[in-house]
């Protein structure tokens, strides 16, 4: 086969045995004959344009292939080239800050190469740039030292934010016979050579790993550190841990993407992998537009957030089959950074589109449909993806721990949480942040319904709170009680009106309103409230709950005396305190700093105590 347009093609090797022939085409599913000897999930190139595909079923010498590109123009009898390897990703310096499609093709490089906003068919560009020089510094590995899978042998400063640690591939071992001196190298240059049983092996900075196979670890550890999101309602009521799994189901327009993006911008993770899977192209372009401008401060240095982020963009107008691959590509990249000892967060937006891709492929294969037409193996596929999260002890030396946290957005049609994808996901994940259409319509964002959401990591995090914020756990319990009580009271209020309630119930209603409007609600697009550090969250809670306790005490202790304290009396006397309570969220953590905010909150607590003492006297 001649090379076309100067692009080198992999079919230059004329091996007739390695060809099969197209037998039938049905959308992204191609059937090929004369394919005996090929393996499940083997990568193939279909047709004269060499479209990337993957074998998903074998019968006799017929293979069913799902193609990750547009199949228009493929005809019966076209050659199918077997590559003999599974669908894999390239791991090495150059991942962060770049944007890939579902099968890890670098979109920026393709755009520069072709000057087109669309990806041409059969384009064959390496995932990581081959001509860039990276500065390699060897670690304490010398010639003659023994090295096994997962050991660190060098560091590349990929950018000023992330140190890219060079790992031995998991299954490698041997005695070092050569290690490159410090200097600039390309990803394909040999930087390490080992010998084992008389066989020499050479390693470059580049590793290739099959996406459907989880990377091995020494052991899984229980998670014990919170994934702080900067969103008050999530950090206080429904915390997630580093290494946890979370689902954000919600109807359209409830703010799933804004929560995912807020997590990517402000969470306490070291690396973010953002997978846009079958969502709008505008959402990915928004990420590309916003992230380079946002900064994060680490060890006193301000850096662009894009330096810790990699994007896997597979928008709704890209081929369906690649949606399935994009989730696996994202999780494999995450596991690679986890193995370096980093805490990684992976956002999948949205897993429903991924399930729909499974449904479409399954329909074309004429498999037996289960609930709502989804394939019977939907639950198993979802589980195999979510179970790759977790906090782990990494392979190799030196000892290090890493974690992968998965946050999956789910968009059930019509916001119905009994949809099969949502139901299957909720059986697997540990944290459920349920978004509510009614709250979103009232413009209460983040629109997380505090009555149906839950987190199963509460107990795992108790030690962390005991050490750092001892007063927090009782405060959280109290908040949940107040919000639950308010829900029960709201029905009575609708029947008989507010005036006929007991005084303590009036206080409960007012404090719940204060909590909802000034604590749970948060404006992602304001400088003071787009990110709320945990000390501010705890301080705000403490003051609001203290106000509740003092009000109830004042009412209950004077109930029998002549000058009764009622809610109206408190409201009239405490106008200033109430105003200060509701303006606590306007304190800007960046401008004011931690010490000033804490001092202000303590001062407010003192003023409040003094005001209540005056009332009761």
From Swiss-Prot:
A GO BP term here is: ATP metabolic process
The residues the record assigns to binding ATP are 250-257
Catalytic reaction annotation: ATP + H2O + 4 H(+)(in) = ADP + phosphate + 5 H(+)(out)
Please name the Gene3D superfamilies in this protein's record: 2.40.30.20, 2.40.50.100, Bovine Mitochondrial F1-atpase, Atp Synthase Beta Chain, Chain D, domain 3 (1.10.1140.10), P-loop containing nucleotide triphosphate hydrolases (3.40.50.300)
User: One Pfam family this chain carries?
Assistant: ATP-synt_VA_C
Identify the NCBIfam families for this entry.
Answer: PRK04192.1, V-ATPase_V1_A
Q: What is this protein called?
A: V-type proton ATPase catalytic subunit A
Q: What is the lineage of its organism?
A: Eukaryota, Metazoa, Ecdysozoa, Arthropoda, Hexapoda
What gene is this protein translated from?
Answer: VHAA
